[in-house]
Amino acid sequence: MQHVNHSSFDKASKAGFIIALGIVYGDIGTSPLYTMQSLVENQGGISSVTESFILGSISLIIWTLTLITTIKYVLVALKADNHHEGGIFSLYTLVRKMTPWLIVPAVIGGATLLSDGALTPAVTVTSAVEGLKVVPSLQHIFQNQSNVIFATLFILLLLFAIQRFGTGVIGKLFGPIMFIWFAFLGISGLLNSFAHPEVFKAINPYYGLKLLFSPENHKGIFILGSIFLATTGAEALYSDLGHVGRGNIHVSWPFVKVAIILSYCGQGAWILANKNAGNELNPFFASIPSQFTMHVVILATLAAIIASQALISGSFTLVSEAMRLKIFPQFRSTYPGDNIGQTYIPVINWFLFAITTSIVLLFKTSAHMEAAYGLAITITMLMTTILLSFFLIQKGVKRGLVLLMMIFFGILEGIFFLASAVKFMHGGYVVVIIAVAIIFIMTIWYKGSKIVSRYVKLLDLKDYIGQLDKLRHDHRYPIYHTNVVYLTNRMEEDMIDKSIMYSILDKRPKKAQVYWFVNIKVTDEPYTAEYKVDMMGTDFIVKVELYLGFKMRQTVSRYLRTIVEELLESGRLPKQGKTYSVRPDSNVGDFRFIVLDERFSSSQNLKPGERFVMLMKSSIKHWTATPIRWFGLQFSEVTTEVVPLIFTANRGLPIKEKSELTTTGD
């Protein structure tokens, strides 16, 4: 995914319009595949629905799309951009300084959004493949659901397997394909609507409210659990803000919304005209003339794949942001594309694949998957509402208006949550379990970092300048390396981690010409790349603070190369003679990076709760990327030293010397 140019963020263009269709609307754009089917099946089948039920259902869909997607997300949430980036973690970075507890809705919302990303590919791809059941020449094959499952799993395997290569050139086709998809939704829906044009009366919210309290509605208020399926992609719309820009979303959303609504109207009209059709039919595919069914199934499958791709890429972006905000374990990441917007995280990719395929095998049909779908995303939306309210207060919006907005959307989304909660026993428990597991991991990681920062001992580097200078000139010790670089998570002004000085002075004195201490600070701005240097009045100590945006790669060696060149040019760093080099003009000596692998010792004197957190974090750490990979040091000279996380001074255990005198009997 290419990141939008900042100068055109609020502008719209033809190219941006098409790109937005391929990136932003995959989830919400494939909802017509299964939303009406879910409504009809919960009512008892096509033969059980009435005109008032169809009008009420479409009305509820229209006004759900209007209130949640259009008003909350397109008109309000898109204003909450963090340097042109959207999504729940970008929103959190905007408001996190207002009060510490806002980490709670951020973690819950991020976890539920990630769990939703595992279910969406299963639902959309299965729904599309099930369309083959209405293709006359293939009915004898795909009436057997096992063949549908096999085809779905094959498509999902290919989809997840190609993630490591990036979307590349194929990604450029997503926009045009989705344009064709939405054009088809609108045109086919409009043509089908001519059979019963009264479906357009559904724009009146009266019909939706009437259905909620009508005895004709077999599900009562819980019908909203199916209605909500129409707007599950609204959160993804906000998350993809940085890839396409606000202007392109504002222009493309009306086109998408009209196309989707026409599709629902067309399906509703077809149902009213075909009350005697089989109850097992999906209204979306059944409403298509048989001679075009195969073409539509292919188009729907492509749209489902694109929607799934957008969710998978969005999951990588979500986790990547969480890792840089230090609220998620640092898993190994690669960048298959030519731009920073494309990230691939192998652990997350195959985790999503395992969950997605398990869901397909567990639920077997899209109808059963729909029963579990939507519960997690209602929680995400509620968490976004909380964070959004604080953002509006921060921007100076009157607290009374913010309170009204929070109450309105809180009640609305709360009702959708309660309506979806009934899905818990019908499969919703799966996504809840996934979300709870992710929340547990994020909480352990975050709390563990807080415990370490609270207990770990820091030393004042100024107190050791003399020792370091003396070591540089001590002829009793051989030169360890010309430049020794320590990467540290903790450096506050002149205070550095005690374990670093222990490594230099106590383990085996490391004699060097220059000692570098590098600390990375992740900024709230996504694409910051700045640094600050303090040499503490010497020419042999260099403290470097790298300020990197939460979307930037933390490839320290490449940044350090630039910093060294600039320090040499300015004369702040003395030239370092180099006798042997393929570059005769090189003025820089060799570098050795020291990575301290901090290990938690169970002998540390911690409270039981803190001990549990640290033990869990140590277990999770076995699955994370090594610092060498995380900081891009694979091709540098690196030494990894195992050091204890020193919370308190470890006293020796009591022991007595055994006396050699022994008492013998007579």
Curated annotation (Swiss-Prot):
Pfam families in alphabetical order: K_trans (PF02705), K_trans_C (PF22776)
Species of origin: Streptococcus agalactiae serotype V (strain ATCC BAA-611 / 2603 V/R)
Localization in the cell: Cell membrane
Taxonomic superkingdom: Bacteria
Organismal lineage: Bacteria, Bacillati, Bacillota, Bacilli, Lactobacillales
Catalysed conversion reaction: K(+)(in) + H(+)(in) = K(+)(out) + H(+)(out)
An example molecular function term from Gene Ontology annotations: symporter activity
Encoding gene per record: kup
The protein's name: Probable potassium transport system protein Kup
Keyword Transcription set for record: no
Keywords: Cell membrane, Ion transport, Membrane, Potassium, Potassium transport, Symport, Transmembrane, Transmembrane helix, Transport
Stretches that traverse the bilayer: 16-36, 58-78, 99-119, 141-161, 167-187, 221-241, 253-273, 292-312, 343-363, 373-393, 402-422, 424-444
Keyword Acetylation applies: no
Coarse class of the protein's main subcellular location: membrane
